[in-house]
UniProtKB/Swiss-Prot annotation:
Organism expressing this protein natively: Mycoplasma capricolum subsp. capricolum (strain California kid / ATCC 27343 / NCTC 10154)
Family: Belongs to the universal ribosomal protein uL29 family.
Gene name, Swiss-Prot/TrEMBL: rpmC
InterPro entries associated with the record: Ribosomal_uL29, Ribosomal_uL29_CS, Ribosomal_uL29_sf
Residue segments, region Unknown: 80-138
A cellular-component GO term for this protein: ribonucleoprotein complex
Residue segments, region Disordered: 103-138
Any GO BP annotation: translation
Region (Large ribosomal subunit protein uL29): 1-79
Annotated protein name in UniProt: Large ribosomal subunit protein uL29
Length: 138
């Protein structure tokens, strides 16, 4: 799978590689932002994006060694990446809030009978615990 990705990357032009690299870096920034806020569900994506960036950097260095000019500056749109991260984060937080509310609702619906608690307490008091006499010296 990685070999096919590298073949695809090697076929791209330098400009396309740089654009892809910057967009992946922006995506990584957004994912790290989500992780810091606590709204990242797919934590494995950070590792995948880092590997993809490394593959792109390798392809760029191969092109640089072959004599192509790779010193071009193309800026990524970090604002767009952050907006997408915030949108995804809001969805995740809403999902988490809904789950917690459901759990709380289920727990609060379970009613405990006070008489049952008293019976259990009395039964526990009536049980006698025998002391351990095996370790004592005479």
């Amino acid at each position: 799978m990685a070999k096919s990705k590298m073949l695809d990357l090697r076929n791209l032009s330098v400009d396309e590689l740089i654009k892809t690299n910057e967009s992946k870096r922006a995506e990584l920034f957004a994912l790290k932002f989500q992780a810091a806020v606590g709204s990242l569900e797919q934590t494995h994506r950070i590792k995948e994006i880092k590997k993809e960036i490394a593959r792109i950097e390798l392809a760029l260095s191969e092109k640089r060694l072959s004599g192509e000019n790779t010193n071009k500056v193309i800026k990524a749109d970090y604002n767009k990446a952050v907006e997408e991260a915030e949108k995804a984060g809001k969805e995740v937080r809403a999902k988490q809030r809904k789950f917690l509310e459901e759990q709380y609702g289920q727990q609060s619906q379970t009613k405990v009978n006070e008489a049952d608690i008293q019976k259990a307490m009395q039964a526990a008091e009536q049980e006698t615990v025998e002391p351990d006499t095996k370790g004592e010296t005479k």
